[in-house]
Amino acid sequence: MVDATSDPKQVTRQDWIDWAEGTWTDIKQTDTLNVAEGRGEDDTKHICPLQLGLIRRLVKLYTNPGEIVFSPFAGVGSEGVSALKLGRRFYGCEIKNEYVAAAKKNLAKAERAYKTESKTLFAEE
């Protein structure tokens, strides 16, 4: 369960207005990680990369800072990058080796950028 915020500044007035809408039209379609890095020779084009803005919004709405975000289909690590940016921890699973390699790269970059000590699926114990 997500804790009620004791600090109203955690959700801005504009965020509340945007999020209360029935349709989220402010999500940029091009705000995605590079899924081409995870594509193998025999793969077809990934036709539906997930927008980071949507992921960030859902992570912020349904988790608290410090909690774990789990993605059973981690892909190139979009959920993990968004989770780390928002101060959450991340665990993910991915079966495809090319996506695992891309996710490792994206998560390492996010860990450096957001100076997190959180462990990810790809961190060494």
Label the predicted regions.
Residues 1-125:
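Class I S-adenosyl-L-methionine
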